[in-house]
């Protein structure tokens, strides 16, 4: 016998098989919260790549696409709703070929360049330092600037820092004033190179460690601005890189980056973003969850040199990486975004919350039109992705206190000797004492009856939202933009400190206890 739970949103229905319903138990330790979930865990990343900047964030003041000082109005408003905490720019691989002085001054005088990393397209530099930092001010987010170590000089990076942050009577501050900005910007996060083991210079960690020490020496703090200097860190399983940097750079850096992509491999096809089967889906869940083991191992190395955890770990590139959509430009990394990607987002964020004693920032790749993006655009049209909605549902956890949980559920063995729990969860308490719980039912076919022990919590009811779809392969298109969209969720009851949640198959829910 089957019953259907209808969720009130267009194109959204989840069939719940009551006879085959599975169960899971969770205990929320509401009295044991210690670590704050930094809002920067919900960071974004924008690179000069494909249509991320041009046509995505920026169309220029003279465009017939509605804009605010050149920034797309629809995209800007969607990002404001997301409460973006930090935005990384200009790359990525582009950062180590970017020469910042080409992107200042009158736009008609800015030289063009070939974007050799990403499709060989022409970069006109109309979006530069002023455009980026002004956007961050308008969004109310922290800028994170990645400096050029691969092909740039120490002097070039030093002058860029002075240009952005000095309020004195200095050459670069006066040049900034000449270009229309009197007051210096506040810049906290400065990356000293990017992927220096690869596109950022193909360096050995020992060599890069010396370069970091040299370049960072001349990145000075001007007029009360305090830089948080970030060294270029490892790619996923390269634990030697982290060991060498911690040993040879140590507390000369404030943070060390790490990159981890949910990708099938770096040669040949990476698979379609929209055409996949359940085996592919479960493999993806296993691969994305492997980030926990990667984080543990890098953190253990860092603990060896920094027991007090003064040096932050920053996962400043993460997310899914599929083949480009058919008919799009090779090298522009434009991919669709399905319910599968939404689960990669929710499961990854659940993991990140557990390691915030060391992990202080994460930046999903990328914000618009590239890889696992929040937003897709085409000419005047815009669509919000399933990943966008996960970030919006989860933003209640920003700067909240992480609450430890115990979770018991069924697990599945998947390809490549990985094991995937069928339920993922995270919980937090905000500054007003309100508890939020996010739940993911990874099972593609069967519902979960989840019993949550709330302890001494006085909650009497819960309200929430659910994100699901008819199929794992469902996505939002320009023709049908609301296929995967949150809807109110009411399948929850609380009685004497115990909460019962009926979680449909392949669904993500965030609850607020009241």
From Swiss-Prot:
Predominant localisation class: cytoplasm
**Keywords for the protein's UniProt record, in alphabetical order:** Carbohydrate metabolism, Cytoplasm, Glycosidase, Hydrolase
Question: What is known about its subunit structure?
Answer: Homohexamer; trimer of dimers.
A GO cellular component term found in this entry reads: cytoplasm
Specify the pathway.
Glycan metabolism; L-arabinan degradation
Q: Which InterPro entries match?
A: Alpha-L-AF_C, Glyco_hydro_b, Glycoside_hydrolase_SF
> Which BP terms from GO are recorded?
arabinan catabolic process; L-arabinose metabolic process
Q: Where is the active site?
A: 195, 317
Q: Which parts of the sequence bind alpha-L-arabinofuranose?
A: 47, 194, 261, 317, 366
GO MF entry, a single one: alpha-L-arabinofuranosidase activity
- Cross-referenced Pfam families: Alpha-L-AF_C (PF06964)
Q: Which organism is it from?
A: Bacteroides ovatus
Q: Which SMART domains match?
A: Alpha-L-AF_C
Give the enzyme class: hydrolase
Family per record: Belongs to the glycosyl hydrolase 51 family.
Descriptive protein name: Intracellular exo-alpha-L-arabinofuranosidase
Q: Which PANTHER family match?
A: ALPHA-L-ARABINOFURANOSIDASE C-RELATED, INTRACELLULAR EXO-ALPHA-L-ARABINOFURANOSIDASE 2
Point out the annotated site residues (description: Important for substrate recognition): 321, 366
> At the top level of its lineage, which domain of life is listed?
Bacteria
Q: What does this protein do?
A: Involved in the degradation of arabinan and is a key enzyme in the complete degradation of the plant cell wall. Catalyzes the cleavage of terminal alpha-L-arabinofuranosyl residues in different hemicellulosic homopolysaccharides (branched and debranched arabinans) and heteropolysaccharides (arabinoxylans).
- Which reaction is the catalytic activity of this chain? Hydrolysis of terminal non-reducing alpha-L-arabinofuranoside residues in alpha-L-arabinosides
Localisation: Cytoplasm
Its Enzyme Commission number?
3.2.1.55
């Amino acid at each position: 016998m089957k019953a259907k739970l209808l969720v009130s949103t267009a194109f959204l229905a989840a069939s719940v098989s009551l006879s085959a319903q599975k169960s899971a138990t969770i205990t929320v330790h509401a009295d044991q919260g210690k670590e704050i979930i930094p809002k920067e865990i919900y960071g974004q990343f924008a690179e000069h790549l494909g249509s991320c900047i041009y046509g995505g964030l920026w169309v220029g003041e003279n465009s017939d696409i509605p804009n605010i000082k050149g920034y797309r109005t629809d995209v800007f408003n969607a990002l404001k709703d997301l409460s973006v905490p930090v935005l990384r720019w200009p790359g990525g691989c582009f950062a180590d070929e970017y020469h910042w002085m080409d992107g200042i001054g009158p736009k008609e005088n800015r030289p063009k360049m070939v974007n050799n990393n990403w499709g060989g397209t022409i970069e006109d530099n109309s979006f530069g330092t002023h455009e980026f930092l002004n956007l961050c001010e308008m969004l109310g987010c922290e800028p994170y600037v990645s400096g050029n170590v691969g092909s740039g000089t120490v002097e070039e990076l030093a002058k860029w820092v002075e240009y952005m942050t000095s309020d004195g009577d200095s050459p670069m501050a006066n040049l900034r004033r000449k270009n229309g900005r009197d007051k210096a910007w506040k810049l906290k996060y400065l990356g000293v190179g990017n992927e220096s083991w690869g596109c950022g210079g193909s360096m050995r960690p020992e060599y890069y460690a010396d370069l970091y020490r040299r370049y960072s020496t001349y990145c000075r703090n001007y007029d009360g601005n305090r830089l948080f200097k970030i060294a270029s860190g490892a790619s996923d399983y390269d634990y030697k890189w982290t060991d060498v940097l911690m040993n040879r750079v140590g507390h000369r850096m404030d943070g060390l980056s790490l990159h981890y992509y949910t990708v099938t491999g770096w040669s040949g096809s990476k698979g379609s973003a929209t055409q996949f089967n359940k085996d592919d889906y479960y493999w993806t869940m296993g691969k994305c969850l492997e980030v926990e083991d990667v984080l543990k191992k890098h953190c253990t190395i860092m603990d060896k040199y920094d027991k007090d955890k003064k040096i932050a770990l920053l996962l400043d590139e993460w997310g899914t990486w599929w083949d480009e959509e058919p008919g799009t430009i090779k090298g522009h990394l434009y991919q669709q975004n399905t319910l599968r990607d939404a689960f990669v987002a929710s499961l990854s964020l659940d993991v990140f919350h557990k390691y915030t004693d060391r992990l202080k920032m994460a930046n999903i790749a990328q914000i618009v039109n590239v890889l696992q993006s929040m937003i897709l655009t085409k000419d005047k049209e815009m669509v919000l992705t399933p990943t966008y909605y996960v970030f919006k549902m989860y933003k209640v956890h920003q700067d909240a206190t992480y609450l430890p949980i115990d979770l018991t559920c069924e697990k599945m063995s998947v390809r490549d000797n990985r094991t995937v729990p069928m339920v993922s969860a995270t919980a937090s308490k905000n500054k007003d004492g309100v508890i939020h719980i996010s739940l993911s039912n990874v099972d593609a076919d069967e519902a979960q009856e989840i019993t949550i022990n709330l302890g001494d919590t006085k909650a009497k009811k819960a309200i929430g939202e659910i994100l699901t779809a008819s199929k794992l392969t469902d996505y939002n298109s320009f023709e049908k933009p609301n296929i995967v969209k949150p809807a109110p969720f009411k399948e929850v009851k609380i009685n004497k400190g115990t909460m019962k949640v009926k979680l449909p198959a392949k669904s993500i829910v965030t609850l607020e206890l009241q």
